[in-house]
Swiss-Prot record:
It comes from Mantis religiosa (Praying mantis). GO terms for biological process: neuropeptide signaling pathway. Keywords: Amidation, Neuropeptide, Secreted. GO terms for cellular component: extracellular region. According to PubMed:19808072, a longer form of this peptide exists. InterPro entries: Periviscerokinin. This is Periviscerokinin-2. Mediates visceral muscle contractile activity (myotropic activity). The keyword tRNA processing does not apply. It is found in: Secreted. The lineage of its organism: Eukaryota, Metazoa, Ecdysozoa, Arthropoda, Hexapoda.
Amino acid sequence: GASGLIPFPRL
């Protein structure tokens, strides 16, 4: 849940 990280905001 590292919201903000692209392109995987769910990582």
